[in-house]
Amino acid sequence: MNFTNFDFDQLFAMGDDTNPLMMAIWIIPIILFVFYGQRIQLYITSGEIKKGIKKLDSFKEESRNELIDYIKKNLNPKDDPVKKIDRFLDYFTIMPVDMDPNGIVDKVRHTVRSREDYTREHVKSLSPETSNLELTKVQTLLEIASSLQMFYKIVNHMFLTAKKQNNYPLILPLQMLLPFIMEHAEAMKEAIPALKAGQPIGDGIGSMVVGKMMLDRQKETVAFQTVLAKTEFENRKLFLLKAEGPSSTVGRPADALETIVSNDKLDAIIMIDAALKMEGEDSASIAQGFGAAIGGIGVERFQIEAIATTNNIPIFSIVVKQSVKEAITLMTKEIADQADDVRLQVYEMIRENTKQGQSVLIIGVGNTAGVTQ
């Protein structure tokens, strides 16, 4: 057979629309995509999602193993902690009914704090002599391991459900959300070494700024795991508030504010916190704003806003922008270097918005792991 004289025009009948081979080449793919298009797309997408699920599974197991190893090495439990830890990892929280929104915040606060108290007491039961520093580390590591396990379970459930029903539209939302889920999961996994070592994370920049201002000042505990110091600046009284470091905790600034307001008159509140940057924004950039700069599910912010409204206290905020990964992993040099600049901006904000003789509360918001005062 002479392949040098092969005539493609004759084979595909480029000039003849009635050629059967040419018609088959066009019609067969159309039929396949009409009747099996979703299934083909499902198979293609499934490969990408399977890789993500495999990663989530490895993150889940790695965080669990690191938590158990840390407890065995640092808490010296009397009994094997594996069964109790596995039970903790499967714990869930049912949020209160919100059909009637009246009083929902108090219910959520009660539910969340009850869970926190329960976890703290049961972790402490592993080793009653455990220091508060080690206790907060284990609590944070437990939350990370529990969150990674929940990520894995939800993604795996959605994937298996779509695959079982051959339902491509059901898998589309998962395909779109998976990159964001993986970004959070990878950040949590990379946060474990810093938290185990008791090193500062990006979210602690607010605590770091206020912690430096507290140095050589007398401190007092005004709320659970929350400390207060008093100082003066240009004939203005400053109240400095942050979570009690170097424990891995965010404290309870709203309860502390309630205590302070009951004893002293405040003329302004300045809150310093980390904030998620938008794509295209520079990491470690500083921005000023108005309103309560504090994350979480909203309980603390609601309480702070309510107290400020009742007492007619304006709330100013300064945030240091960073990515999700930077916020929960070891604090970068770029973010840490902004602490002094933020402090100078705080002083400038005090000059611009208060008069001599007035009082200002400065709250360093965020996880204070590795940050003293």
Regions found by a protein language model. Name each.
Residues I315-Q373:
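C-terminal functional extensions of proteins
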Residues I44-M208:
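Electropositive, gly/pro-rich neighborhoods at or near active sites that engage anionic ligands
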Residues N2-F3, M22-I25, T221-E232, L344:
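…; additionally, a secondary subgroup of soluble metalloenzymes is captured
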Residues M1-D17:
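Short, strongly hydrophobic alpha-helical membrane anchors
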Residues A287-I307:
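Gly/Ser/Thr-rich active-site loops/lids in small-molecule metabolic enzymes
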Residues L21-Q38, V210:
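Alpha-helical membrane-embedded segments
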Residues T136, S146, M150-K153, P200, ...:
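Conserved active-site and cofactor/substrate-binding residues in soluble primary-metabolism enzymes
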Residues L172-F290, N311-P314:
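Glycine- and small hydrophobic-enriched segments that form the cores of compact globular domains
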